[in-house]
Curated annotation (Swiss-Prot):
MF terms (GO), sorted A to Z: electron transporter, transferring electrons within cytochrome b6/f complex of photosystem II activity; electron transporter, transferring electrons within the cyclic electron transport pathway of photosynthesis activity; oxidoreductase activity
Entry-linked InterPro entries: Cyt_b/b6_C, Cyt_b/b6_C_sf, Cyt_b6/f_cplx_suIV, Cytochrome_b_C_euk/bac
Protein name: Cytochrome b6-f complex subunit 4
Organism per entry: Desmonostoc sp. (strain PCC 7906) (Nostoc sp. (strain PCC 7906))
Family: Belongs to the cytochrome b family. PetD subfamily.
Disulfide bonds: none
Functional note: Component of the cytochrome b6-f complex, which mediates electron transfer between photosystem II (PSII) and photosystem I (PSI), cyclic electron flow around PSI, and state transitions.
A Gene Ontology cellular-component term: plasma membrane-derived thylakoid membrane
Subcellular location: Cellular thylakoid membrane
Spans traversing the lipid bilayer: 36-56, 95-115, 131-151
Protein's UniProt keywords contain tRNA-binding: no
Claim: Thylakoid is one of the keywords in the record: yes
GO biological process entries: photosynthetic electron transport chain
Length: 160
């Protein structure tokens, strides 16, 4: 049985830390043996059972045989490459498209240097990183949805 240490709420230093939002839960159950012997094996066995059940209930389908004389009108990449495909498809110059794709990781590398004065972990207290993340997520979704549409409707997503 695990021994739990209760916090002394009459301690002025602890009260000052809690008032600043610096409190952490150091007083819960230890990871050994509770999580390592009981929780982790259940999660691993449950995940394995779910994977086996999905493999049995929905086996992989083999597609129709390839016909080299009948190609589709527009060949689309896999779903995770839709945003990159849309960048290359919508920009008129190939070099401009490659530079736009290269600017994405470079911009992500620069985010920690832009906000290096802010040491908080809470996303609500890190406005630059949160704004960059939300903007990047929305642009990626917009590009990904637009890549599945025809070129004339792809930039407006067919709304206008």
């Amino acid at each position: 049985m695990a021994t739990q240490k209760k916090p002394d709420l009459s301690d002025p230093q602890l009260r000052a830390k809690l008032a600043k939002g610096m409190g952490h839960n150091y007083y819960g159950e230890p990871a050994w043996p509770n999580d390592l012997l009981y929780v982790f094996p259940i999660v691993i066995m449950g995940s394995f059972a779910a994977i086996v059940a999905l493999a049995v209930l929905d086996p992989a389908m083999t597609g129709e045989p390839a016909n080299p004389f009948a190609t589709p009108l527009e060949i689309l990449p896999e779903w995770y490459l839709y945003p990159v495909f849309q960048i290359l498809r919508s920009l008129p110059n190939k070099l401009l498209g490659v530079l736009a794709m290269a600017s994405v990781p470079l911009g992500l590398i620069l985010v920690p240097f832009i906000e290096n004065v802010n040491k908080f972990q809470n996303p609500f207290r890190r406005p630059v990183a949160t704004t960059v993340f939300l903007f990047g997520t929305l642009v990626t979704l917009w590009l990904g949805i637009g890549a599945a549409l025809p070129l004339d409707k792809s930039l407006t997503l067919g709304l206008f």
